[in-house]
UniProtKB/Swiss-Prot annotation:
This is Type III pantothenate kinase. ATP binds at D6, I7, G8, N9, T10, N11, I12, K13, T134. Its EC number is 2.7.1.33. It is found in: Cytoplasm. The active site is at D110 (proton acceptor). PANTHER family: TYPE III PANTOTHENATE KINASE. Substrate binds at G108, S109, D110, R111. InterPro entries: ATPase_NBD, Type_III_PanK. It comes from Ehrlichia chaffeensis (strain ATCC CRL-10679 / Arkansas).
Protein backbone atom coordinates (compact mmCIF):
# COMPACT_ATOMS: atom_id res chain seq x y z
CA UNK A 1 0.00 0.00 0.00
CA UNK A 2 0.98 3.60 -0.59
CA UNK A 3 0.56 6.71 1.50
CA UNK A 4 0.49 9.82 -0.70
CA UNK A 5 0.96 13.02 1.28
CA UNK A 6 0.26 16.56 0.07
CA UNK A 7 1.64 19.09 2.57
CA UNK A 8 0.05 22.47 1.90
CA UNK A 9 0.06 25.80 3.70
CA UNK A 10 -3.42 25.27 5.11
CA UNK A 11 -3.87 21.49 5.27
CA UNK A 12 -1.94 18.25 5.09
CA UNK A 13 -3.79 15.71 2.97
CA UNK A 14 -2.90 12.06 3.39
CA UNK A 15 -4.32 9.41 1.08
CA UNK A 16 -4.08 5.72 1.89
CA UNK A 17 -3.96 3.95 -1.46
CA UNK A 18 -4.16 0.36 -2.64
CA UNK A 19 -3.84 -0.81 -6.25
CA UNK A 20 -3.39 2.84 -7.27
CA UNK A 21 -6.81 3.77 -5.86
CA UNK A 22 -7.55 6.07 -2.94
CA UNK A 23 -9.25 4.11 -0.17
CA UNK A 24 -9.14 6.75 2.57
CA UNK A 25 -8.49 10.49 2.72
CA UNK A 26 -7.24 12.18 5.89
CA UNK A 27 -6.97 15.95 6.33
CA UNK A 28 -4.93 17.53 9.12
CA UNK A 29 -4.46 21.26 9.68
CA UNK A 30 -1.00 22.52 8.78
CA UNK A 31 -1.31 25.17 11.47
CA UNK A 32 -1.11 22.64 14.32
CA UNK A 33 2.48 21.45 14.11
CA UNK A 34 2.96 17.87 15.27
CA UNK A 35 5.83 15.49 15.93
CA UNK A 36 6.40 12.28 13.96
CA UNK A 37 4.95 10.35 16.90
CA UNK A 38 1.76 12.42 16.89
CA UNK A 39 1.31 11.97 13.13
CA UNK A 40 1.73 8.22 13.54
CA UNK A 41 -0.86 8.00 16.33
CA UNK A 42 -3.36 9.88 14.16
CA UNK A 43 -2.62 7.81 11.05
CA UNK A 44 -2.53 4.44 12.82
CA UNK A 45 -5.85 5.15 14.56
CA UNK A 46 -7.47 5.81 11.19
CA UNK A 47 -5.97 2.66 9.69
CA UNK A 48 -7.19 0.57 12.63
CA UNK A 49 -10.72 1.84 12.01
CA UNK A 50 -10.40 0.56 8.44
CA UNK A 51 -8.94 -2.78 9.60
CA UNK A 52 -5.69 -1.92 7.85
CA UNK A 53 -2.27 -2.82 9.20
CA UNK A 54 0.28 -0.02 8.94
CA UNK A 55 2.95 -2.68 8.36
CA UNK A 56 1.47 -3.21 4.88
CA UNK A 57 2.56 0.28 3.81
CA UNK A 58 5.48 -0.17 1.43
CA UNK A 59 5.87 3.29 -0.08
CA UNK A 60 5.37 6.91 0.92
CA UNK A 61 5.47 9.79 -1.56
CA UNK A 62 5.39 13.41 -0.45
CA UNK A 63 4.62 16.73 -2.08
CA UNK A 64 5.40 19.64 0.21
CA UNK A 65 5.42 23.42 0.10
CA UNK A 66 6.07 23.67 3.87
CA UNK A 67 9.65 22.55 4.65
CA UNK A 68 9.14 22.73 8.43
CA UNK A 69 6.44 20.04 8.19
CA UNK A 70 8.38 17.89 5.73
CA UNK A 71 10.95 17.00 8.40
CA UNK A 72 8.57 15.26 10.90
CA UNK A 73 6.79 13.52 8.00
CA UNK A 74 10.13 12.10 6.84
CA UNK A 75 10.79 11.00 10.43
CA UNK A 76 7.35 9.36 10.50
CA UNK A 77 8.22 7.43 7.33
CA UNK A 78 11.62 6.31 8.55
CA UNK A 79 10.84 5.60 12.21
CA UNK A 80 7.52 3.79 11.88
CA UNK A 81 7.45 2.42 8.32
CA UNK A 82 11.18 1.93 7.75
CA UNK A 83 10.76 3.78 4.46
CA UNK A 84 12.84 6.57 2.95
CA UNK A 85 10.02 8.53 1.33
CA UNK A 86 10.14 9.93 -2.18
CA UNK A 87 9.97 13.73 -2.12
CA UNK A 88 8.49 15.05 -5.37
CA UNK A 89 10.73 17.67 -6.98
CA UNK A 90 11.24 19.26 -10.36
CA UNK A 91 13.69 16.59 -11.54
CA UNK A 92 10.79 14.11 -11.59
CA UNK A 93 9.25 16.11 -14.45
CA UNK A 94 11.67 14.44 -16.87
CA UNK A 95 10.19 11.02 -16.06
CA UNK A 96 6.87 12.18 -17.51
CA UNK A 97 8.38 14.20 -20.38
CA UNK A 98 7.05 17.38 -18.79
CA UNK A 99 8.92 20.53 -19.74
CA UNK A 100 9.05 23.49 -17.36
CA UNK A 101 9.44 26.67 -19.38
CA UNK A 102 9.34 29.10 -16.47
CA UNK A 103 12.00 31.52 -15.25
CA UNK A 104 14.51 29.67 -13.03
CA UNK A 105 12.46 26.49 -13.64
CA UNK A 106 10.69 27.16 -10.32
CA UNK A 107 7.48 25.20 -9.80
CA UNK A 108 5.88 24.14 -6.51
CA UNK A 109 5.78 20.37 -6.02
CA UNK A 110 2.00 20.46 -5.56
CA UNK A 111 1.64 22.15 -8.92
CA UNK A 112 3.98 19.61 -10.52
CA UNK A 113 1.86 16.78 -9.11
CA UNK A 114 -1.22 18.47 -10.58
CA UNK A 115 0.45 18.71 -13.98
CA UNK A 116 1.59 15.08 -13.91
CA UNK A 117 -1.99 13.97 -13.28
CA UNK A 118 -3.65 16.47 -15.63
CA UNK A 119 -1.40 15.61 -18.58
CA UNK A 120 -2.41 11.97 -18.18
CA UNK A 121 -6.13 12.55 -17.58
CA UNK A 122 -6.47 15.10 -20.40
CA UNK A 123 -3.86 14.19 -23.03
CA UNK A 124 -3.39 16.26 -26.19
CA UNK A 125 -5.26 19.25 -24.74
CA UNK A 126 -4.18 22.79 -24.01
CA UNK A 127 -5.00 23.10 -20.32
CA UNK A 128 -5.59 25.85 -17.81
CA UNK A 129 -5.22 24.25 -14.38
CA UNK A 130 -6.53 26.34 -11.49
CA UNK A 131 -5.33 25.38 -8.03
CA UNK A 132 -7.78 26.75 -5.47
CA UNK A 133 -5.82 26.43 -2.27
CA UNK A 134 -4.29 28.92 0.13
CA UNK A 135 -3.26 30.79 -3.00
CA UNK A 136 -5.10 30.59 -6.31
CA UNK A 137 -2.66 29.47 -9.00
CA UNK A 138 -3.42 29.52 -12.74
CA UNK A 139 -1.06 27.21 -14.67
CA UNK A 140 -0.91 26.90 -18.44
CA UNK A 141 0.05 23.50 -19.82
CA UNK A 142 0.10 22.98 -23.57
CA UNK A 143 -0.68 19.77 -25.44
CA UNK A 144 3.05 19.06 -25.70
CA UNK A 145 3.21 18.83 -21.88
CA UNK A 146 5.09 22.08 -21.47
CA UNK A 147 4.13 24.36 -18.58
CA UNK A 148 4.91 27.82 -19.85
CA UNK A 149 2.98 30.40 -17.85
CA UNK A 150 1.20 31.11 -14.60
CA UNK A 151 -0.60 33.71 -12.54
CA UNK A 152 -1.02 33.71 -8.76
CA UNK A 153 -3.77 35.39 -6.73
CA UNK A 154 -5.02 35.18 -3.13
CA UNK A 155 -7.12 32.19 -2.17
CA UNK A 156 -10.66 32.57 -0.85
CA UNK A 157 -9.60 31.83 2.74
CA UNK A 158 -6.91 34.51 2.58
CA UNK A 159 -9.58 37.01 1.54
CA UNK A 160 -11.77 36.00 4.47
CA UNK A 161 -8.96 36.10 7.03
CA UNK A 162 -7.53 39.40 5.78
CA UNK A 163 -10.81 41.24 6.35
CA UNK A 164 -10.84 40.07 9.94
CA UNK A 165 -7.14 40.69 10.47
CA UNK A 166 -6.97 44.20 9.03
CA UNK A 167 -10.21 45.65 10.39
CA UNK A 168 -11.25 46.45 13.94
CA UNK A 169 -14.89 45.41 13.84
CA UNK A 170 -15.47 42.97 11.00
CA UNK A 171 -15.89 39.34 12.12
CA UNK A 172 -14.27 36.27 10.62
CA UNK A 173 -16.76 34.37 8.47
CA UNK A 174 -16.92 30.99 6.79
CA UNK A 175 -16.94 30.69 3.03
CA UNK A 176 -20.19 29.24 1.76
CA UNK A 177 -22.28 29.21 -1.40
CA UNK A 178 -24.47 32.29 -1.79
CA UNK A 179 -27.58 32.51 -3.94
CA UNK A 180 -27.72 36.31 -3.95
CA UNK A 181 -25.25 39.15 -3.78
CA UNK A 182 -26.88 41.79 -1.56
CA UNK A 183 -27.81 41.04 2.06
CA UNK A 184 -29.13 43.00 5.04
CA UNK A 185 -26.69 41.74 7.71
CA UNK A 186 -22.94 41.99 7.98
CA UNK A 187 -22.20 38.25 8.16
CA UNK A 188 -24.05 37.36 4.97
CA UNK A 189 -22.79 40.52 3.29
CA UNK A 190 -19.19 39.49 3.95
CA UNK A 191 -19.83 35.89 2.88
CA UNK A 192 -21.42 37.15 -0.32
CA UNK A 193 -18.61 39.59 -1.04
CA UNK A 194 -15.98 36.89 -0.62
CA UNK A 195 -17.92 34.23 -2.53
CA UNK A 196 -19.08 36.31 -5.49
CA UNK A 197 -15.91 38.39 -5.50
CA UNK A 198 -13.84 35.22 -5.80
CA UNK A 199 -16.02 33.85 -8.60
CA UNK A 200 -15.76 37.17 -10.43
CA UNK A 201 -11.97 37.07 -10.08
CA UNK A 202 -11.84 33.49 -11.40
CA UNK A 203 -14.04 34.28 -14.39
CA UNK A 204 -12.21 37.53 -15.10
CA UNK A 205 -8.83 35.80 -15.02
CA UNK A 206 -10.06 32.98 -17.26
CA UNK A 207 -11.43 35.49 -19.77
CA UNK A 208 -8.20 37.48 -19.85
CA UNK A 209 -6.00 34.38 -20.11
CA UNK A 210 -8.02 32.98 -23.03
CA UNK A 211 -7.92 36.36 -24.78
CA UNK A 212 -4.18 36.65 -24.24
CA UNK A 213 -3.48 33.08 -25.37
CA UNK A 214 -5.79 33.31 -28.40
CA UNK A 215 -6.71 29.63 -28.26
CA UNK A 216 -9.24 27.31 -26.69
CA UNK A 217 -8.29 26.00 -23.28
CA UNK A 218 -9.79 23.12 -21.34
CA UNK A 219 -10.15 24.45 -17.81
CA UNK A 220 -9.93 22.26 -14.73
CA UNK A 221 -9.86 23.23 -11.08
CA UNK A 222 -8.43 21.46 -8.08
CA UNK A 223 -7.79 22.17 -4.43
CA UNK A 224 -9.82 22.52 -1.28
CA UNK A 225 -12.15 25.20 -2.61
CA UNK A 226 -12.82 23.78 -6.08
CA UNK A 227 -16.01 21.94 -5.11
CA UNK A 228 -17.43 25.11 -3.60
CA UNK A 229 -17.09 27.20 -6.74
CA UNK A 230 -17.59 24.67 -9.53
CA UNK A 231 -20.78 24.87 -11.62
CA UNK A 232 -21.88 28.10 -10.02
CA UNK A 233 -21.49 30.61 -12.79
CA UNK A 234 -17.84 29.82 -13.47
CA UNK A 235 -16.21 29.01 -16.79
CA UNK A 236 -14.52 25.89 -15.37
CA UNK A 237 -15.13 22.71 -17.36
CA UNK A 238 -14.33 20.12 -14.69
CA UNK A 239 -12.97 19.66 -11.19
CA UNK A 240 -10.40 17.16 -9.99
CA UNK A 241 -10.35 17.51 -6.21
CA UNK A 242 -7.70 14.79 -5.82
CA UNK A 243 -5.49 15.95 -8.69
CA UNK A 244 -2.37 16.41 -6.54
CA UNK A 245 -2.78 13.00 -4.91
CA UNK A 246 -3.39 11.41 -8.32
CA UNK A 247 -0.10 12.88 -9.52
CA UNK A 248 1.70 11.33 -6.56
CA UNK A 249 0.05 7.97 -7.28
CA UNK A 250 1.30 8.16 -10.87
CA UNK A 251 4.82 8.83 -9.64
CA UNK A 252 4.53 5.79 -7.38
CA UNK A 253 3.41 3.68 -10.34
CA UNK A 254 6.34 4.76 -12.50
CA UNK A 255 8.93 4.28 -9.76
CA UNK A 256 7.62 0.91 -8.56
Amino acid sequence: MLIAIDIGNTNIKLAICANNKIIKRITISSQSRRTADEYFIYLNSTMNQLNLDYKNINNIIISSVVPSITKPIIELSQNYFNIDPTILSNHHADIFNIKISLQNKVLGSDRLADIIAASSLYPHKDLLIIGMGTATVFNLLNKDKCIYGQAIAPGAHILAKSMRQYTALLPEVLISKQDKVIHDNIYHAMESGIYWGYITMINGMIEKIIKEEEKDLYIIATGGNSNLFFNHKTAIHNIEVDLTIKGLIQLHTVLS
